[in-house]
Amino acid sequence: MTAAVQSPVLPLLEKENVADIAIPEGDSTYWWRTSGQDLSRMLQEAGYPDEAKRQFLNYFRDTICPTLGGKPDSNALRTAVGWDGSPFEYSFEFKESTKSAGVRFVVDLTQLRPGDKSAPLTTKTTENVIESLSKKTPLFDDNWHRALSQWFVYSHAPESEQKALVAAAGYQTNIIMGFDINAKILDLAPGYLPIMAKSYFPPCFVAEAKGFTRWQALSLGIRQIPDIGSHPNILLALKLIEDYVAAKPELAGGARGLSTDFVKAGKARLKIYMRYLGDDFEEVWDYYTLGGKIPDLESDKEMFRDLMTLSSPSTYTEEDWKDTQVDPRRRAAFKTKPTAVYFSLSPDKPYPIPKVYFYPARAAPNDKVIARGLDAWLTKYNWHDGGKSVEERVESVFTHRKLEENPGIFTFIGLGRKEDSTKKGLSLQVYMTPELYVTPRF
């Protein structure tokens, strides 16, 4: 259906050739030469079909890269995604019931390089990408996205108010976009891109503007969706979370975001993202289960306990630290990254589907020991497919430094039940950031 479908498969760039290419300052090809190639290698490592790779990478190069502006420099405004300010975070998804890996990523498309000084909360660049998705992705529907935008986004506020909100929040991000690259779409909906998209909204601006807590901003953001009353299971699931937070009011400040899918109401989910400052596993587990109110989770408990050890300093030895270059800036940034919990609300369940995200870089000496810990976990629970390890895959994807040098590539490690009510089992998401602000590469 699109011209991109007819173009040849986009090749991986050889490392030695990339190093010889002069990237003009401000040229959007920078993003193709960095994140484009990272994602290309991820799709290769995950075994995606050539046609799915070609269609996605064409779209990424031709639509997403030009939106991102110039190469980051010392004056570049930070995004709300990567720990270093990078606009990208990628993930491999592994499932208990299947041996194939999936590839996802989120990107902050906010106009930051350069920024819009008179309208710092503009969403024009993000909306341009959403408009392109409306024509190229199957079952596209943005009604819930629009409803949430009216609540969370302050791009139409007066300039003085926008600047005050940015000063209070510490960043300019109204919306973050998420992409699930799904090759099955090529068979189920020929002619469309192999992409399912979602949008994420931080609560900070509406909380600041209206005097709410961040948790109130999220909860009320759901309740103000015009047709939400037609989906009683979503409201029942939300009430379980509201009751838990009401009993533990210290959790309200940990509200981090709300997302929805670009599909019609009745199929779309709403996902609530929370941070949790504690390190006690039993407390984390109580949060994950909402005090035991979410059914059928107890049998998974030891798998979560084992995964959480990757975030514990006691897990690592002097031998693990021997090759690490200690970077105080990184260590300070990682100390601010607590455990996270998300709750997915869907129209077909009266309770949320939860997931816990651990942040092993808070304690781990470097990325190599995190990768090996993940591989040991996958092997212990018989998830490893006998092919490449996580360590080998990640080393193939990220070529800008060695994993043993520092932590920072691995970010959150998420584990939780699948959301599809017809399927059982757990899914593991391994999040990674390309470190493009601290390591621009070119």
Swiss-Prot record:
Q: Which InterPro entries match?
A: Aro_prenylTrfase, Aro_prenylTrfase_DMATS
Pathway per its UniProt entry is: Secondary metabolite biosynthesis; terpenoid biosynthesis
Keywords from the named record? Transferase
Coiled coil regions in record = none
Question: What's its EC?
Answer: 2.5.1.-
Keyword Oxidoreductase assigned: no
The record's section on CDD domains has: PT-DMATS_CymD
Q: Which family does it belong to?
A: Belongs to the tryptophan dimethylallyltransferase family.
Read off the domain note: Residue Gly-257 plays key roles in substrate selection of farnesyl diphosphate (FPP) for farnesylation of cyclopolic acid.
Q: Which purpose does this protein serve, as stated in its record?
A: Prenyltransferase; part of the gene cluster that mediates the biosynthesis of the phthalide-terpenoid hybrid 11'-O-desmethylfendlerol. Within the pathway, mfmD is responsible for farnesylation of the cyclopolic acid intermediate via an O-prenylation reaction. The biosynthesis of 11'-O-desmethylfendlerol begins with the NR-PKS mfmB that forms 3,5-dimethylorsellinic acid (DMOA), which is then transformed into the phthalide 5,7-dihydroxy-4-(hydroxymethyl)-6-methylphthalide by the cytochrome P450 monooxygenase mfmA and the hydrolase mfmC.
The protein's name is DMATS-type prenyltransferase mfmD
Species of origin reads: Annulohypoxylon moriforme
Q: Which gene encodes it?
A: mfmD
